[in-house]
Amino acid sequence: MAARKSKGLTLMEKMIRLETERLILRDYTADDLEQYCRLKMDAKTMYYLQDIQLHSFDEAERDFAAVLSDMASANRRFYFLHMELKRNHEQVGGIGYTVEADTPVGKLVHLGYFTYPAFWGRGYTTEALAAVLR
């Protein structure tokens, strides 16, 4: 899933997009600000991730700007993807990983996901995780 950093590619050409039977997993774009904020501020969705839950639009906006900045970085560390249904583009949640360290055998990453409760128990996260790990 790691973005290839080839010289001469634009940010749009470097953007990650994965598809599964039911989902589209893709890098966030500036147009996703409202959805990102709603997801990261949702108390039920973030119940088990309270350390990264956001509590105001201003806080969410700053966090989202950092996400977009990291995506454009030559040393990208955060690979968190917008997760949406193929059939209607409804946001399911987010999934991805953070590169914690480079080791002799590869990158050490911290994997995470968060989905809206309406999508729990339907296999979406399992499906997305399989695509991310490929």
Task: Name each region found by the language model.
Residues 121-126:
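Glycine-rich acyl-CoA binding loop
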